């Protein structure tokens, strides 16, 4: 299953849990349908991402301004099957020009305080090394996809913002504190139903409960 497509002109996505998705964790819509990259301002903070991949993780953002602040990334068994996504915060790409943006439009990103958990037993030593590097410097986890166009002037520095983009005030925790807050309160938390309880247990324990019905493994569903 896919995670979601997030975007907006002044949108904050915070304290969400995305678990067991093969891709789109999330896909950022960008300004491809509006043609107004300066107005696309999207804030992602204090979210928990678990067991994404192996197709992809978070990606796209063709035009726009984005904060990635204090999110918690926990690779799971499916993530661990593909080394290059185990430490990926996001993979931005240029617009291909088929909608309203001009071809070659990139998003701009502020990235700070994001944390990767390396407790999954299936992670390779290479993945654990890269996770440590990403925790020390979050930009190690930003992986531009240049298939639709080269980086501006060929330099990743040109899609970096030195300051976060202004959005509505949001109570912000450290990534590690947010992990506990999200797992304690996300979803219908007053009385957990069996689905929410199962997913949260999977996240806490770093495992999965079910295989897919049509051949998918490592916790990914493949039927509706």
Residue positions per predicted region:
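Right-handed parallel beta-helix
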Residues: 1-28, 32-33, 38-53, 65-77, ...
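Glycine-rich beta-solenoid repeat tracts in large extracellular/virion proteins
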Residues: 2-7, 24-36, 55-62, 79-103, ...
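Long, contiguous C-terminal flanking segments immediately downstream of a protein's structured core
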Residues: 73-224
């Amino acid at each position: 299953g896919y995670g979601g497509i997030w975007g907006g002109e002044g949108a904050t996505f915070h304290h969400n849990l995305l678990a067991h998705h093969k891709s789109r964790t999330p896909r950022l819509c960008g300004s491809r349908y509006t043609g107004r990259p300066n107005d696309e301002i999207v804030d992602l903070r204090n979210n928990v991402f678990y067991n994404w991949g192996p197709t992809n993780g978070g990606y796209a953002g063709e035009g726009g301004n984005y904060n990635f602040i204090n999110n918690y990334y926990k690779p799971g068994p499916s993530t661990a099957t593909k080394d290059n996504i185990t430490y990926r915060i996001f993979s931005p790409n240029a617009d291909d020009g088929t909608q309203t943006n001009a071809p070659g439009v990139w998003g701009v990103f502020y990235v700070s305080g994001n944390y990767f958990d390396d407790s999954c037993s299936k992670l390779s030593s290479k993945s654990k090394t890269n996770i440590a590097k990403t925790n020390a410097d979050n930009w190690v986890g930003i992986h531009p996809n240049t298939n639709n166009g080269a980086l501006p002037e060929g330099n990743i520095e040109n899609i970096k913002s030195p300051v976060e983009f202004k959005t509505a005030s949001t109570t912000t925790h450290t990534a590690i504190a947010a992990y506990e807050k999200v797992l304690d309160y996300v979803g219908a938390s007053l009385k957990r139903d069996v689905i929410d309880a199962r997913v949260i247990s999977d996240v806490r324990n770093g495992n999965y409960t079910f295989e897919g019905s049509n051949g998918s493994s490592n916790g990914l569903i493949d039927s509706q």
